[in-house]
Amino acid sequence: MKFSEIISQFGETGTNHSLTSNPDHDPEIIGVAAIDEATNGTLSYVEGPKFGSFVSKTNATALILPQDEKLQELAQENGIVWISTSDPRLLFAKAIALFYQPYRPVPEIHPTAVIHSSAKVGSDVYVGPHVVIQQGVEIGDGAIIHPNVVIYPDTKIGDRTTLHANCTIHERTRIGADCVIHSGAVIGAEGFGFVPSRTGWLKMEQSGYTVLEDGVVVGCNTAIDRPAVGETRVGRNTVIDNLVQIGHGCQIGSGCAIAGQAGMAGGVKLGNRVILAGQTGIANQVKIGDGAIASAQTGIHSDVAPGEIVSGTPAIPYKLYLKVCAVYSRLPDMYQSLKQLQRKFKNSND
């Protein structure tokens, strides 16, 4: 694919590029690569001026650059064609899609699949080997169900949704259109509902529903639990990493991003566009406002306001957390100084 062809795919975001001043230099691009691993014929990207040293060292043929004239000149000097944009990483993501298409099997129902007679399977659906689809299940048009998936009764899967191998969809689950559930994920299993009694822990039946709205992505080995009553709900276009625990009755807004090993106790409510970095933990019934961000390993025990950035355990405002970190390594010396002052004060009083 010629560099000019790639530019044409970007539309209005691809108007500032090296071909404007040098239209004859239009090399063939055969793939994409990280800038430090790029080879001749590949396209890569640079996010900001601090990565300028990579531009002079890379073997990439083409680069996506920020709107920085110095980087553009440096690329030109090194014979690299370029296109500039306000968001290089976003444009690079679009470029990858030009060279790589995810595996999509041809629609068919494998003879080893077990499908209950009451299940409804839409058109152009792929059902792989050893899939189990139980009674009352509804599968939308164009869905892809990879090998060994188990779908419990009273479940609905939306159009064009993909269920990867070995994931499990429990009863009373509703999954919207264009969702992706990765391998090993478990959607709608019983929430951790036990009530103390004189004879031990009494199991509270989890009779509610688990709802994933359109465009949700769930990573490998993530669990999203079904509540005793009501719903556990994940809003549209929310993306969830591997190994995430979402407790029963959680309400997650639209456009959220939840990184690996984050965990939410029951009844947590996230607003829209919330970001939880890896290993964030949220206590029972906590509310997180729209656009809030929690950095890695944050422990949240109380509500977080919209747009707030928090860090640490227990969670505190991010700027305060940075000050605490700056003091932390000095605590032993500060403690020794305090002991000396205490001794001096005691001696002066004797």
Swiss-Prot record:
Assembly and oligomerization: Homotrimer.
Taxonomic lineage of the native organism: Bacteria, Bacillati, Cyanobacteriota, Cyanophyceae, Nostocales
Gene designation per UniProt: lpxD
Name under which the protein is recorded: UDP-3-O-acylglucosamine N-acyltransferase
Recorded family membership: Belongs to the transferase hexapeptide repeat family. LpxD subfamily.
GO MF entry, a single one: structural constituent of carboxysome shell
Disulphide-bridged cysteine pairs: none
Record's catalysed reaction(s): a UDP-3-O-[(3R)-3-hydroxyacyl]-alpha-D-glucosamine + a (3R)-hydroxyacyl-[ACP] = a UDP-2-N,3-O-bis[(3R)-3-hydroxyacyl]-alpha-D-glucosamine + holo-[ACP] + H(+)
Secretion signal span: none
